[in-house]
Amino acid sequence: MDKLLIRGGRSLKGEVLISGAKNATLPELCACLLTSAPVTLTNVPRLQDVATMLKLIRNMGVAAERSDDGRVTVDASALSSPEAPYELVKTMRASVLALGPLLTRFGEATVSLPGGCAIGSRPVDQHIKGLTAMGAEIVVEHGYMIAKLPKGWTRLKGARIATDMVTVTGTENFLMAATLAEGVTILENAAQEPEITDLAEMLIKMGANIEGHGSSRIRIQGVESLHGCTHQVVADRIETGTFMCAVAATGGDVLLKHGRIDHLEAVVEKLRDAGATVARVEGGIRVQSQGRLKSQSFRTTEYPGFPTDMQAQFMALNCISHGTAVVTETIFENRFMHVNEMVRLGANIQIDSKVAVVEGVEKLSGATVMATDLRASASLVIAGLVADGETVVERIYHLDRGYDQMEAKLRGLGADIERIK
């Protein structure tokens, strides 16, 4: 099993190209199932989750071709199976995104309950609630969600959907299903993430009638059919934020090409308060940092607040900053699993339920640590970059699920990092 060997102590300098967003690519691949015409996505990252999704839709009879330049062309004209089996999706939470498109295209769908990171229950009940409001009949049995249209129905029907909580994948599922539903669908309490806006813009290119995306209230007027399009996947804001924290922690100077400050304002504000320089420049974002920064307390919330997917990486920065930081996780339970591994590197962190208190230390020391989930693995890489001596990060298959060639990009910025067996 692959590991990362990191020899810490080097500043990061240079330029790095930010890849397309995993959390936009996955729903957009599912959106390709809504039409029998070819759809081309560009700027598609090379990630394990993307490979899994491509394998899944190919298993349904879809033709999906990938080129070396980040282009994927999907032709779902021969879509033949409405099933997403457990064997294919057990490692990936995003499998639930196939439910809405398959139900819309086939009138039925059988989708395995999702896998992915073990960072909380992330229930599917909101998906079921929303699609049921549109008329779907759904049961959960033997580990599968089995959905169908009522007898005599040919389409879902528009509805007002108000979820009990903000749900990103739920909003995406309802958005895709509503494009071809009969009548108007109103999504209240909708998630506002840039990846949802990007999905909506792709669907509009395909002929959908959508208003209000990027706000908490989205209106979709169903249409008879969708057509193909070419769409560039938005840059990955979490990869952008991860590299920002790595540069800030190591005392570097890096241009993040294609990075967008407007998608990361809560993180940028905290980095500036900590003492880093973050500037919008032509072609991306420039991050500069010198010396030890000031610890920053923060609370994770839904977008546009501080993203839960950046909590672990910013905690790594807090570990070696001046002062004490209080980190409150409000989105997922079990999202402090990286803390014990950081403590192995010399960090001073105390946990009480959903709150972590981080007392900054002058230095970390290299050790062998184990990645427990996707963002935890990135945080351990950042900690390893600043630790004295050698750090080995095990179980980096988590990292490969969500970061496109991370060690190669870091090496290009001057880090001493290599993949080993």
From Swiss-Prot:
In its UniProt entry, the species of origin is given as Albidiferax ferrireducens (strain ATCC BAA-621 / DSM 15236 / T118) (Rhodoferax ferrireducens)
Does the keyword Magnesium feature in the UniProt annotation? no
Give the main location. cytoplasm
What is the protein named? UDP-N-acetylglucosamine 1-carboxyvinyltransferase
User: Which reaction is this enzyme known to catalyze?
Assistant: phosphoenolpyruvate + UDP-N-acetyl-alpha-D-glucosamine = UDP-N-acetyl-3-O-(1-carboxyvinyl)-alpha-D-glucosamine + phosphate
Pathway annotation from the record: Cell wall biogenesis; peptidoglycan biosynthesis
Any one GO MF term held by the record is: UDP-N-acetylglucosamine 1-carboxyvinyltransferase activity
The residues listed in the UniProt record as binding phosphoenolpyruvate, with positions renumbered to this chain, are K22, N23
Domain of life, source organism? Bacteria
From the UniProt record, list the coiled-coil ranges. none
Give a single Pfam family match: EPSP_synthase
Q: Which family does the record assign?
A: Belongs to the EPSP synthase family. MurA subfamily.
